[in-house]
C-alpha cells in the first residue's frame, strides 16, 4: 500500500497559513486542502437547500453525505457546479461560522479530510489539523504572527475602506483569537510535535522556502 505524505499547517487567523500552505503545496506538487473552505462549502450547500443545522441536524448531515463535493485547493465543486467564487462572500462566511461549530458537521469534515490525506500527498491548513485531524501527519507546522503585525497587514490590505482603523482591527483579531482558542469544539491549538514558526519579519517567499527546507530535512529522515 502506497504511503502518502501529509503536511499539517495550523495557526491563528491572519497568520498567512493558507497562502503559505498553498504555495508550499505548489512547490511540492502536492494537493492543497483549505479546510476552512470545506466548511464554507457545507454551509453554502445547506443554505441554498434551505436547511438549518440548528433546526434539523440529521437532515443536514444526510444531505451533505448524499451530495458530491470536490475540493482542490481554492477550487470547489458541488454536484459538478463550480462554487469557488461565491464561497468567498461574507454572507457564506457568516453561515459557515455557525455550521462549523456543530460537532457532527466537524466529525463529517474531519473524516473527509482524513480520507483525502489517505489518498493523496497533501498540504492541509486549518486550526486543528495537527492536533485533531491529522495527528499522524509526517510534518506539522504552526505559523504564528503577533496581533500587531496581523493588524498592520489587514489595515494595509483594506486601506481603501473608510472608517477602518488599527485599534478596531487589533481588537477584532484579539477577540477572534480568544474565541478560536477557547471554543469547546476543535479549539485552535499548537500540536505538541509541531514546528512553530514566527513569521512577523518574513516575506511570503521566505516563509515558504523555510517550510520547504524543513520538509526536505524531515523527508530524508523518513526515507521517502
Curated annotation (Swiss-Prot):
An example Gene Ontology biological process: pyrimidine nucleotide metabolic process
Q: Can you say where in the cell this protein is located? A: Cytoplasm
Primary location: cytoplasm
Q: InterPro entries attached here?
A: Cytidylate_kin, Cytidylate_kinase_dom, P-loop_NTPase
- Enzyme Commission code: 2.7.4.25
Keyword flag Lipid metabolism: no
**UniProt-recorded Gene Ontology molecular function terms:** ATP binding; CMP kinase activity; dCMP kinase activity
Among CDD domains, the record links this protein to: CMPK
- Has UniProt tagged this entry with the keyword Nucleotide-binding? yes
Q: Which family does it belong to?
A: Belongs to the cytidylate kinase family. Type 1 subfamily.
> What is this protein's record name?
Cytidylate kinase
User: What organism is the protein native to?
Assistant: Ureaplasma parvum serovar 3 (strain ATCC 700970)
